[in-house]
């Protein structure tokens, strides 16, 4: 069995590739950015170009991790070109070459500002182009599956925010702020944040290779969820041996600071580490549910294990030459 990881040079793809190598699984990486970990497995290509996708026509399984997701993407048409039209090209490749299994990583962004404990049956209510185009891409793959449901397998995975070693997304930004000792807790800290450790996400993708024919849709969240008090306390415990939240301020103070930071940022034409949007995200509950137990999957790491490993790698150990992945 030959597996092609489309978008495999990125954060999730690199971790998945390491797991495949460990498990002696035959894989190749198709990406427009060279893999820093597996250059010998790398095939250069762009999912917007059908002629380049032909390089992986000999695949048995396609895993599509390729996506445009940053908030500052320009032109905005790239969301549709890559997330939607690229998915159509992948389905065309599968259709023309008898590839009957596709695994697609979507996102909980399709739910938008969802109610707590939203599961796979939650209302689709995206609020940005990323969520919109991820949902449209799901539809593209479902259309492909419905053409021959007797013989095809489609796995759609909607992860929540993913963190881990080398990632430079919102979770890292929070951990780095705490590490800088320029952090203050706003609010009562009881708001919950669903998260996913990257090695667990990779393990679930690997697990999904065994799924039988059919359409499989799962949110991916590492349970149990943490609230902000727990997240900050664990972080401070690892970094400073002080398992508490430290300085705490009322929520309205945090909001005020965020608005002031917005004004300063506008004047100096430079992004600051704090903003009204980041304060709003910090104070909000972002909690999802999942039916992962139906898939008979057990995550190899607890959420706390993943957090501790990430903190030690990023802020305690000497990893000067570490590879990083810029996300937002």
What are the residue ranges of the model-derived segments?
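N-terminal Rossmann NAD(P)H-binding glycine-rich loop of SDR-like oxidoreductase domains
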Residues: 3-22
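Conserved Rossmann-fold NAD(P)-dependent oxidoreductase catalytic core, especially the SDR/UDP-sugar
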Residues: 89-129
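Mid/C-terminal beta-alpha module of Rossmann-like enzyme folds, strongest
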Residues: 208-273, 301-311, 318-328
């Amino acid at each position: 069995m030959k597996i092609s990881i489309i978008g495999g040079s990125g954060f999730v793809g690199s971790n998945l590739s390491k797991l495949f190598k460990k498990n002696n699984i035959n894989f190749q990486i198709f990406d427009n950015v060279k893999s820093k970990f597996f250059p010998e497995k790398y095939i250069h290509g762009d999912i917007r170009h059908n002629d380049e996708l032909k390089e992986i026509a000999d695949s048995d399984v396609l895993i599509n991790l390729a996506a445009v997701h940053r908030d500052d993407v320009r032109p905005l048409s790239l969301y549709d070109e890559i997330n939607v039209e690229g998915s159509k090209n992948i389905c065309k490749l599968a259709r023309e070459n008898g590839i009957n299994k596709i695994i697609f990583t979507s996102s909980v962004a399709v739910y938008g500002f969802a109610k707590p404990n939203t599961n796979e049956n939650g209302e689709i209510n995206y609020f940005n182009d990323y969520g919109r185009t991820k949902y449209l891409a799901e539809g593209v793959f479902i259309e492909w599956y419905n053409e021959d449901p007797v013989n095809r397998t489609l796995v759609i995975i909607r992860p929540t925010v993913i963190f881990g070693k080398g990632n430079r997304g919102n979770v890292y930004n929070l951990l780095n702020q705490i590490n800088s000792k320029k952090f203050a807790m706003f609010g009562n800290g009881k708001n919950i944040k669903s998260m996913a450790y990257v090695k667990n996400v990779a393990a679930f993708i690997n697990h999904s290779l065994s799924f039988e024919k059919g359409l499989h849709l799962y949110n991916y969240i590492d349970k149990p969820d943490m609230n902000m008090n727990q997240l900050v306390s664990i972080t401070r415990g690892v970094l400073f041996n002080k398992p508490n939240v430290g300085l705490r301020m009322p929520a309205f103070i945090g909001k005020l600071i965020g608005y002031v930071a917005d004004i300063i940022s506008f004047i100096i034409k430079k992004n600051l580490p704090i903003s009204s949007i980041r304060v709003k995200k910090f104070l909000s509950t972002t909690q999802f549910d999942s039916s992962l137990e139906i898939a008979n999957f057990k995550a190899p790491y607890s959420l706390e294990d993943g957090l501790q490993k990430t903190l030690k790698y990023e802020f305690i150990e000497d990893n000067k030459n570490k590879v990083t992945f810029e996300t937002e």
